[in-house]
Amino acid sequence: MEFRDQVLDLLTEVAETNVIKENPDVELFEEGIIDSFQTVGLLLEIQNKLDIEVSIMDFDRDEWATPNKIVAVLEELR
């Protein structure tokens, strides 16, 4: 499975919605798809499933605003 697909699957699981795969440019926070609790869960899942450690201090809502942006950030970190 491609890295992008892994990230989108993980986001879909955390957000509990398929809109992420249907529209990877959707604004996750503005649209209320992911909240602060889910953000923490997302960072833990990224560490557990993708073996990429992201501190909550490194998390920037603007840089992580859409699924496509999250894929790009994680590509740089891997």
Curated annotation (Swiss-Prot):
Q: What is this protein called?
A: D-alanyl carrier protein
Report the pathway entry: Cell wall biogenesis; lipoteichoic acid biosynthesis
Q: Name one Pfam family in it.
A: PP-binding
Q: What is its main location?
A: cytoplasm
O-(pantetheine 4'-phosphoryl)serine PTM positions: S36
PROSITE patterns recorded: CARRIER
- Gene3D superfamilies under this entry? ACP-like
Where, per UniProt, does this protein localize?
Cytoplasm
Can you tell which superkingdom this protein's organism belongs to?
Bacteria
Q: Give the protein's function.
A: Carrier protein involved in the D-alanylation of lipoteichoic acid (LTA). The loading of thioester-linked D-alanine onto DltC is catalyzed by D-alanine--D-alanyl carrier protein ligase DltA. The DltC-carried D-alanyl group is further transferred to cell membrane phosphatidylglycerol (PG) by forming an ester bond, probably catalyzed by DltD. D-alanylation of LTA plays an important role in modulating the properties of the cell wall in Gram-positive bacteria, influencing the net charge of the cell wall.
Q: Where is the Carrier domain?
A: 1-78
- What gene is it encoded by? dltC
Q: Which GO terms describe its biological process?
A: cell wall organization; lipoteichoic acid biosynthetic process
Regarding how it is modified after translation, the entry says: 4'-phosphopantetheine is transferred from CoA to a specific serine of apo-DCP.
Q: Which family does it belong to?
A: Belongs to the DltC family.
Extract one GO molecular function annotation from the record: D-alanyl carrier activity
